[in-house]
């Protein structure tokens, strides 16, 4: 499908999506698309479209998932094919100061021993990003371990990244790593990991409409929780998206 913003969305059979390229997932069934909801959370409500590709009214049929097609020029912007769609190894990111001249940020966080999920609502803006070396985002971030080699991170939110997507549109994204961004993990569905179950939401696709100063406001609410079956499950706007099977090393 051709999206009004220029993206091409492919409807891929659920069992043929990139996650099942992983040796430990080959031949397995996709995650349950109606997982048990945590106490205190509402079940699925009437879904309000929030992505540009859905404004035409088209969607993918049942049994398939919508995957944004990667363009050749997007891969060429990466430092290497291996690094495409991945963050580079980093030191400590989780800082509460804003003294850097290059990285302006604000962080709210809680520490504890046993968290089985989190929920965040984020206002969606479309700030101008000048070049491929800049980005803007709002995300929730669930981590364990230290910022050494044992960091595990699960992330989701919206981001504007000309380096990754080639434009200045805010896009719904996910990310994961199990070794502090060294060799594992990626954005969205650009490697084996995230198993998508929803046929109406495309991870990596543009969000529309967005908030305006003094005008109407738009947000996205994301819920991530761990099931008793050891799956990490994602919901956005009260609709299940998919998740990760932690038994497979994610």
Tell what function each PLM region has.
Residues 1-250:
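Exposed, interaction-prone regions of secreted/extracellular proteins
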């Amino acid at each position: 499908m051709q999206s009004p913003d220029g993206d091409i969305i492919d409807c891929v059979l659920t069992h043929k999506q990139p996650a099942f390229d992983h040796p430990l997932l080959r031949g397995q069934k996709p995650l349950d698309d109606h997982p048990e909801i945590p106490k205190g959370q509402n079940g699925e409500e009437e879904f309000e479209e929030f992505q540009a590709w859905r404004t035409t009214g088209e969607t993918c049929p049942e049994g398939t998932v919508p995957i944004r097609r990667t363009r050749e020029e997007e891969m060429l912007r990466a430092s290497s094919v291996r690094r495409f769609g991945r963050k580079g190894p980093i030191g400590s990111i989780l800082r509460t100061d804003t003294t850097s001249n290059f990285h302006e940020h604000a962080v709210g966080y809680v520490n504890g021993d046993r968290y089985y999920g989190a929920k965040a609502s984020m206002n969606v803006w479309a700030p101008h990003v000048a070049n491929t070396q800049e980005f803007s985002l709002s995300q929730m971030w669930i981590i364990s371990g230290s910022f050494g080699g044992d960091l595990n991170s699960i992330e989701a939110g919206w981001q504007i990244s000309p380096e990754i997507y080639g434009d200045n549109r805010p896009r719904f994204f996910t990310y994961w790593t199990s070794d502090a961004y060294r060799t594992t993990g990626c954005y969205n569905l650009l490697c084996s990991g995230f198993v998508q179950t929803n046929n109406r939401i495309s991870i990596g696709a543009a969000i529309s409409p967005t908030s305006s100063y003094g005008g109407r406001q738009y947000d996205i609410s994301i819920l991530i929780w761990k099931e008793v079956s050891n799956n990490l499950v994602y919901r956005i706007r009260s609709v299940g998206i998919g998740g990760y099977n932690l038994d497979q090393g994610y």
